[in-house]
Design a protein with these regions (language model features):
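Sterically constrained small-residue positions within well-ordered secondary structures
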Residues: 13, 114, 140-141, 266-268
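Hydrophobic/aromatic-rich core segments of domains that either
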Residues: 110-190
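Alpha-helical and coiled-coil interaction segments, frequently adjacent to or embedded
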Residues: 170-310
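Residues at beta-strand starts and edge strands
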Residues: 7, 145, 271-273
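Bacterial N-terminal signal peptides
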Residues: 5-16
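Secondary-structure boundary elements
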Residues: 23-104, 110-113, 119
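Sec/Tat signal peptide C-region and signal peptidase I cleavage site
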Residues: 17-22
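N-terminal secretory signal peptides that target proteins for export/translocation
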Residues: 1-2
Length: 310
C-alpha cells in the first residue's frame, strides 16, 4: 500500500507534470507516429525537407507548433561548452545547428524561432529573466539570464520554452527529460517563472506582476501549478509572502496524482480547509497535523478531507 504524506505547514507535493496541451488520444498517437517516422527514416534529408515532411497536411497551428517543439526537445541537448563554441546561433545555418545538436537557451530559442517561421507560425524570441536562469547580464538596457519563445495560436500568445522542455542539468550534466509543461504555457502560469522587461504580450500587466513581485516568487511556484494548483492563487499568496517555498518534493512516482483543491498557504490558517486529490496510484493519503495522522477519505480515485486546523 502506498502512502503519501501531505505536511500541514508546507504542502509537500510531487511534481507530476500535467500535459500542457490535450489532443484526442487518436490524434496524439497519429502525431507521435509522424514525428517518430520523420526522425527515424528521414535523417538523411536536410532540415527544410524534414520540416515539410513533418508538417505536410497539418492544418492546425497548435499541432504544427507541438511537432516542432517535440522535434527540438528530443534532438538538442544543453551543452554550455558547445554553446561557447557556437557563439551567436544566428550566424550558423539550421543545418549546422542540427548537426551540432546542442547549446544553451540561445540555441534552443533560435532554432525554435526559425522552425516556427518556416512553418508559417507567428512567433517571437523573448529575452528576459527566468527563475532558474543563471549568469544575468545586460542585453541593451535589460537584465537577461534566459531566452525563450512565444507563439500565437488561435489569436492568443503563449510561452514556449524548448530549453526547459528538453530536460534538466545536474551534477552529472544534461539529462533528457522531455516535458510538455513548457509548451503553450498559459499566461498566468508563465508569469510565475518568466519576466519580460518589455512585457510584449501584456502578461505581467494583466496579472499585476512587477519586477519586485517576480523576485519574491519562489522557483518552485510553476511546479506547484504543474501539480494542479491554481496559478492565480499561487500568485496572490506570494503578494504577501517572503518567497517561501510552495512545493517540497521527495521520492515519488512521477505523475502519480493531481491536485483538485488545496490551500496555497505556507502556513495553514485557522479555518476549515478542503483538500481534494486525484490518484490512480496511491491507495491511501494522509495529512500530518502536529503529531496526528489524518486520513483522506477515498472514493474511487478521489481522496478528500475537510481539515479544521487546531
Amino acid at each position: 500500500m502506498s502512502v503519501f504524506k501531505l505536511f500541514a505547514l508546507v504542502l509537500g507535493l510531487s511534481v507530476g507534470m500535467q500535459d500542457a496541451v490535450a489532443f484526442a488520444p487518436h490524434r496524439f498517437d497519429a502525431l507521435e507516429r509522424r514525428l517518430n517516422h520523420v526522425n527515424s527514416t528521414h535523417a538523411q534529408l536536410n532540415v527544410d525537407q524534414r520540416l515539410r515532411d513533418l508538417t505536410n497536411g497539418i492544418r492546425s497551428d497548435k499541432e504544427k507548433a507541438w511537432l516542432i517543439y517535440q522535434w527540438v526537445i528530443r534532438h538538442f541537448r544543453h551543452d554550455l561548452k558547445l554553446s561557447a563554441r557556437i557563439g551567436d546561433p544566428g550566424k550558423h545555418s539550421l543545418e549546422e545547428l542540427f548537426r551540432l545538436g546542442g547549446g544553451s537557451c540561445a540555441v534552443y530559442a533560435n532554432v525554435t524561432q526559425r522552425l516556427f517561421d518556416k512553418a508559417g507560425l507567428q512567433a517571437r524570441t523573448v529575452y528576459g529573466t527566468a527563475k532558474s536562469g543563471t549568469n544575468t547580464r545586460q542585453f541593451g538596457s535589460m537584465p537577461v539570464n534566459h531566452v525563450w519563445n512565444a507563439v500565437k495560436i488561435d489569436g492568443e500568445w503563449h510561452t514556449v520554452d524548448t530549453t526547459w522542455g528538453a530536460g534538466v542539468v545536474g551534477d552529472g550534466g544534461f539529462e533528457r527529460v522531455p516535458s510538455e509543461l513548457f509548451f503553450l504555457m498559459r499566461p498566468e502560469m508563465a508569469v510565475l517563472s518568466y519576466f519580460d522587461e518589455k512585457d510584449q504580450f501584456g502578461f505581467q500587466k494583466r496579472f499585476g506582476v512587477t519586477a519586485s513581485l517576480f523576485r519574491q516568487i519562489p522557483e518552485d511556484a510553476m511546479y506547484a501549478v504543474g501539480a494542479g494548483f491554481d496559478p492565480r492563487l499561487v500568485l496572490n499568496q506570494q503578494r504577501g509572502s517572503t518567497g517561501s517555498p510552495v512545493v517540497k518534493t521527495f521520492d515519488h512516482v512521477p505523475g502519480a496524482f493531481k491536485v483538485i483543491n488545496a490551500p496555497v498557504l505556507g502556513r495553514l490558517s485557522k479555518r476549515p480547509l478542503k483538500l481534494q486529490l486525484e490518484s490512480e496510484v496511491f491507495d491511501e493519503m494522509v495529512v500530518v497535523q502536529g503529531k496526528k495522522w489524518i486520513h483522506l477519505m477515498k472514493r474511487g480515485n478521489t481522496h478528500a478531507l475537510e481539515l479544521n486546523p487546531d
